[in-house]
Amino acid sequence: MAAVWQQVLAVDARYNAYRTPTFPQFRTQYIRRRSQLLRENAKAGHPPALRRQYLRLRGQLLGQRYGPLSEPGSARAYSNSIVRSSRTTLDRMEDFEDDPRALGARGHRRSVSRGSYQLQAQMNRAVYEDRPPGSVVPTSVAEASRAMAGDTSLSENYAFAGMYHVFDQHVDEAVPRVRFANDDRHRLACCSLDGSISLCQLVPAPPTVLHVLRGHTRGVSDFAWSLSNDILVSTSLDATMRIWASEDGRCIREIPDPDGAELLCCTFQPVNNNLTVVGNAKHNVHVMNISTGKKVKGGSSKLTGRVLALSFDAPGRLLWAGDDRGSVFSFLFDMATGKLTKAKRLVVHEGSPVTSISARSWVSREARDPSLLINACLNKLLLYRVVDNEGALQLKRSFPIEQSSHPVRSIFCPLMSFRQGACVVTGSEDMCVHFFDVERAAKAAVNKLQGHSAPVLDVSFNCDESLLASSDASGMVIVWRREQK
């Protein structure tokens, strides 16, 4: 069963940064050999139930051995070899829909593990339950993350030395999305309502635009990097999604929206990058197989409005979708079939578009509950706690920003798990980039970057937080350099 061995490899890859932290070559050899063995064993035809049991036990054992994970972007930053060893090009992608064992699984309903979030919480608490409040993490697992995070306060850590570079190739058209490549310090991409996507390289100096991806006939609303960064998926107002090769910028495939509607957002399934979820203007969410260009059977659902934002949890079992009428829906994602099952609905505020959703399974040692960061045109940034394994949400706190009409986005900072406090970053219609400490009871504002001349729509950190990119409604992309302590 191809999907299961990919999930096992993904679990191993997430923990790989913790193996022999001072000898990265050993980690590279390990994950390559692991990939080879898993591929060979996948052909042996073991029963799917046995494979799933192995996956579950493997995850539990790794969790007990190495402790709770920080987010993939921070943990894997120490091991770029993981990316190379788990490349997912179209040539090597498994045909998800044609897998006979996956097809056979459709004959019965397969639910998500009911204890997945409880297990995560137990694993997280186990490391800390006997420690006094405020004590440092007492495990060797913390060394790498503490070294990357440093011993400075949040205010000191998020002091910026100024602008590193300004990209203006999309000037006069909004840039709704900017993203650094996964586990990469210097590769950046941004999409524009002029219908193109830019792939940029920040090092060696001077920063350059490597490729401009053209093909969409209307504005590009969103895009996403694959885990291995070799593929990008983009969605457009021209009612198509496109698959691009990042190495040379060529379009590999164009896939029309099943409803013929404007496509407004997209995200990769984090465990199986053969699947991408898209949201459209006809209120629908679709799971798409990018190898076949087809919609996955059972992988569609309808919301109450235009789908503007999507986000998976780290294991890929929960999906949240936000619409322009103020609702956030959670879905259970069946790993075997790609089927979506609608679970919960939260009305953030009736009539207020939900423009951004960012999920984080483990914010910091002071905030270990799975969390969701939401922008919703309320002049507030909202932080929710995920309270059960069906994605139900409970408001934890809010932060004041200016957002009443623009599609502003926000992110969790990637290296926050072992700091005192935890930081989030958001754009704003006041033309500034805002930093907030989610654990600080009063005066949560940590920093504010000024330099844009239009509402800031999106923000993105590179893997080690040395650079931050922000994009605005006038088409400007600013790369900020963090002050070195």
Curated annotation (Swiss-Prot):
Keywords: Methylation, Nucleus, Phosphoprotein, Repeat, WD repeat. The modification Omega-N-methylarginine is found at residue 114. GO terms for molecular function: promoter-specific chromatin binding. The lineage of its organism: Eukaryota, Metazoa, Chordata, Craniata, Vertebrata. GO terms for cellular component: centriolar satellite; nucleoplasm; plasma membrane. This is WD repeat-containing protein 13. WD repeats lie at residues 170-210, 215-254, 302-341, 406-446, 451-484. Its main location: nucleus.
